[in-house]
Amino acid sequence: MVAHNPKRLTWTLAACALIACSSGESAKAGAGDRDSSGSGGGDRTLVVFNAGSLALPLRAALDSFAAREGVTVQQENAGSLETARKLTELGKIPDLVAVADYEVIPLLLIPEHATWYAKFAHNRMVLAYGDRSRGAAEINTGNWWQVVTRPGVQVGRADPSLDPNGYRTLLVWQLAERFYKQPGLAQRMLASAPARNVRPKEADLVGMLQAGEFDYIWSYESIAQGTGLKYVTLPEEIDLSSASDSAAYAVASTRIAGKTPRDSVTMRGQPIVYAFTVPTRAPHAALAAKFAAYLASGDGRRVLRGAKLDVLERYLVVGSGAPPSL
C-alpha cells in the first residue's frame, strides 16, 4: 500500500523543521541547534542523546516531562552508532541514551558505560518519496524494486557505519533479492544509491527528498508519517518488522565497525526494536530514572504514540541495575 500525507499540515511543518535540525548536536522544538525546555537551574537539566528517528517522539516526551517536573531538558540527535560513540570515544556522558537498534547498547556500551537496557518500540523500513520523484505515479508494494533500479533514479540512504537505518537498508536489499528471486538485485540497488547519496543518518535525507535532490530515500515508517512523506510499504518478509520472520531476516548480514576502529562485527537481519538506558555515570541519574519511568508510563507511551512511534505495551528490561519503576 502507499500512504499519503496526513491532514495536520501545521504539525507536519513543525516536524520537518525538527528533523532538519537533527545535526548530531542538540535540537530545538522547531528550529536551531540547542534547546532548553521547562524551568529550573543547571542542576536540574536532563540531557538525552538519541537516534535521529527518535527526534520527534522524544522531543514530545521531553517537553511533556519538563512541563510536569519543572526541569530543563537538552536533546542531541544523531545516528545510533554515532550516539554511542559519543560516550565511548568522546567521553560525553548524557543522562539517558535511546537508540534505534537495541543491539547497539550491548555492542558498544555494556559493560563500560551501561549495565541494562529497556526495549520499548518497534518500527519498519519503508521507501519514502515525493510528488516529483521519478516513477511516483506508478510505484507500489509490488513494483518498487523495479522503479528504484531504473536508470537515472537517485536513492538516498543513511551511513551504515553511523546509523542502524544504514545497515538495515543493506539488509533489506539482500532480503529483497531472495524474496523476489532476482540475482544481483542488491547490487543494482546499490548502483541507485551510491556513496555520494549517503548521509550520516536517515533524518538528514528528509530535506533532500523534499528539495528534489533524491527521488526516494530509505527511512522508517515513523519518520515518514511524522514528516508527512508519502511512502511505499514493503512485504513483511523484508521490512524487518515481523517477529515471526526473525529467522528469515537473519540470513541477511553485513559488517560494521565495533568498539574500536580496528574491530568489526556482523549485524544480522532481525525485527527492528528500539531501546534506551541510563549510563552508569549519568550526571543526573535520579532525574534520568524518573524520565525512564515516565517513558514507560501510560502517559509517556501515549505521547510517544502521538508522535507516530510504535511503542510496546510492556517494555522489556535486559540486564541488571535498571530503575525499579521499569
Model-inferred region functions:
Residues H122-N123, P271:
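Short, solvent-exposed loop/turn segments at the edges of secondary structure
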Residues V2-W11:
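Bacterial N-terminal signal peptides that target proteins for export
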Residues T10-A20:
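Bacterial N-terminal signal peptides
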Residues S22-L90, D101, L109-I110, D131-L326:
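Exported/periplasmic ABC-transporter solute-binding proteins
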